[in-house]
Amino acid sequence: TRNESSAASDVYKRQDDRNKLYLQMSKNSKFIPVIDELIGTYSFIDSKDNILWFYTTEGAPNGKIVNLEIKNGSFVWNEVIAESKNAIRSVNIINDSFVINYLEDTFSQISVFNLSGEFISKLSLPKQGTISGFSGGIEDTSSFFAVTNYVTPREIYKIDLTDLSFELFWKEELVGYDSSDYVSRLEFYPSKDGTQIPIHISHKKDLEIDENTPLLIYGYGGFNISILPNFSKSQTAWKNQNGVYAVANLRGGAEYGDSWHEAGMLLNKQNVFDDFAYAAKFLHSKKIGSPSTTAIDGRSNGGLLVAATMLQNPDLYKIAIPQVGVLDMLRFNKFTIGWAWESDYGSSDIKNEFENLLAYSPLHNIKSDVCYPTTLVTTASRDDRVVPSHSFKFAAKLQELQSCNTVSYTHLTLPTTHC
C-alpha cells in the first residue's frame, strides 16, 4: 500500500480470475486472511490513510469498486461505486478521483468519480475506440491516455485531471497512410441461440463490396479476454488488397463482464464456435464475401476456435488459419502450463467434461469423408505454452483424412515461442 505500513496479497487458483485476499498490517507481521474464499476477483487499486480501494466482481459480474477501512484492527467493507450495465476494463485513482474505463459495446467510455463514489463527469473522448493508460498517483493532477481503433493508429493525449481537459501529445504517423481513406463500423448479429454478438467490419472507404470480396474474420472467445478495436499494419495491408476485415466479439471474452465469459466456457464452449460460424453466415447474408472468398484466423485459444469451427462448418470457408492452437483437447492439460486452462476448458479426467471436450476437440473430429478448406497450421519450435505437438498431430491427421484436393500446410517458426 501507499504508506508501506501494510501490504495486500492475492492468491489465485488455476487460470481463474477469482482470488483470495490477505493483508499484512506491518512489515514483519503475518498475513491475515481478509477474503478467504474464491468468490470473485479482488484487485487492489490504491490506498490512502487507513482506506484501501479494490475492484471486485463478487456479486457484480461487470465489476464494482469497494473499499476496506481498517478501524482499530478490524476490517469494514463499503461499496463505493455500484455495478454498472457496462463492464469495467480498468480503474485508476488520480487527483483524488476514480478514473474508470468502462466497455460499452466494445468501445471505451471514461467516467470520473470522487473518492466517495459520486459521479463527476463522463470524458468527451477524441475518438471512439479503445482507451488505455491513466497511470499515476492519487495526488497527481495530470496523466496520459492512448486511443486507437481499427482505422486509427495510436494517439497519446495528456489530460489535466483538475478540469478534464486534454491535448494531443503524440501520434503514430505512417507514411502514405490516411485514416480517412478507411471506414469501420460496429454491427450486431444473432448467434445460433439468438444471442446478439458484436462484430466490427472495416475496409477501404471506396471499396465496392459483393459476394466476390475477400473476407477475413478473426476471433478469440475465451479466458475472459476482450478483443477490442486496435490498429494493425497487417490488417491494413489486407484492406489495401481490397479485402474486408471483420472481428467478432464472441462469448467467452470479457466484453460484457463475467456472464459473457461464463457463457463461453466449460460446458458452454460450443456457444463460441456457434458465434463464430454465425458471423460468417451473417456477413454472407449481407453479400459481404461468400464461402469461396472467406478466410478465418485465430491464435492460441483462437487457433482452437478456427480449427473447431472449420471442422463443424467446412462449407462456410475457403481458408482456415489456426495459429499456435490448442488442438488436442483430451491431453492439453498434460503438458507445461496446460493444467491452468482447465478453468475454461474443463478436464478430460472428469467424465462429463471429457465428453464435452471430445465433442469438439479438433484432433478427434476430423472425418475421412469431408472436404475441408485449405488450412495453414502454424506453430513455434520453442512454444512452451501450447506445445507444437498440438499442431503437428492435427496437421498430420488432416492431411491423412482430407477427402479432396485442397491442401493443408504446416508452418514452423524457428526459434520462437508462443507468438
Residue positions per predicted region:
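Structural motif
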Residues: 16-22, 60-66, 106-111, 152-157
